[in-house]
Regions:
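Catalytic cores and adjacent flexible loops of soluble metabolic enzymes
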Residues: 1-299
Length: 299
């Protein structure tokens, strides 16, 4: 049997400066800006810069407006930030962002613990955000799309129904997130069979299946992926949750498959090692340390 052809190109949104750093001890704004510049210099054209959240709740995201102002408009680059509520969305509008991400969960218990709202309340808030004047495109990131540590499996039909409700609320795009690392290639296929492939994928390496799941989604026809430089990330509401798939590891796979990303992997590895210097510990990305398979040993 001949496998269907892979997409010729994918769009990667690097979330390292927000999702990657939010679980770390705070680093100076100047270092966050330097990291973003390094990621952009590698050719990344879609990047999550910060989150408009309370600095008391998430100290590592203090200074979001300062970070965004320092980056400014970039031709061909989509700059996004996480907004947890209407006030955060208003701040994002004032900052002139190209996109905002909102968080939502397919797990009722996780949603309650994360944003202190029911699923219906979250959908109502997302609708409010989407109806704001001058709101940029909204990407609704649905956590626990492939399972919850509280309820267990989430039925693919329920995930598909929530995608419909999110789009009805005004979301421009929907991204399916494997927040707790419960996805498998089989479950990826089962969900995509009902949601269709016009979704993004946000995958974690909690159980070491992140890249396998990304490849399964790619084979199904998905072309939008979140990943984090150096493989940082996690969730304070999911015990043991590991980082996102590392951008440089996913790019290394895609390069070998002949799938275009527009990203220079060696420059991206430089950004990953910058992260390591800033946080003061070894980052989980294996490609950041071993390099891509195309790298040759020095004589």
């Amino acid at each position: 049997m001949t496998a269907p052809p892979l997409p010729t190109a994918v769009r990667i949104r690097d979330v390292g400066a927000r999702d990657g750093l939010q679980a770390e001890s705070p680093i100076p704004v100047a270092q966050r800006i330097a990291l973003i510049e390094a990621i952009l210099a590698a050719g990344v054209t879609h990047i999550e810069l910060a989150a408009f959240v309370s600095p008391k709740a998430v100290p590592s995201m203090a200074g979001a407006a300062e970070v965004i102002a320092a980056i400014g408009l970039r031709a061909g680059v989509v700059r996004t930030a996480l907004v947890p509520n209407v006030r955060g969305a208003q701040m994002a509008i004032e900052a002139g962002l190209d996109e905002v991400t909102v968080i939502f969960s397919a797990s009722a218990v996780y949603n309650e613990r994360n944003v202190k709202m029911s699923i219906d309340q979250s959908l109502a808030q997302i609708e409010q955000i989407c109806s704001l004047d001058e709101i940029p495109p909204v990407d609704a990131v649905m956590s626990c799309s492939f399972g919850s540590p509280y309820e267990g499996d989430i039925a693919p039909a329920d995930v598909a129904a929530l995608c419909v409700r999110l789009r009805s609320a005004g979301a421009t795009n929907v991204t399916l997130a494997d927040t707790t690392g419960m996805a498998t290639p089989r479950r990826i296929g089962e969900v995509l069979e009902l949601t269709g492939t016009d979704v993004g994928m946000h995958l974690h390496e909690t159980r070491g299946t992140g890249l396998l799941n990304a490849f399964a989604a790619l084979q199904a026809g998905v072309t939008r992926f979140d990943s984090s430089v150096a493989g940082l990330g996690g969730s304070p509401f999911a015990a043991g949750a590991a980082g996102n798939i590392a951008t440089e590891e996913w790019v290394a796979v895609l390069d070998d498959l002949g799938v275009s990303t527009g990203i220079d992997i060696e420059r991206l590895i430089e950004a990953a090692m910058l992260v390591e210097a800033f946080i003061g510990r070894r980052v989980p990305s294996r490609v950041a340390h071993a390099g891509p398979r195309s790298r040759r040993a020095s004589s």
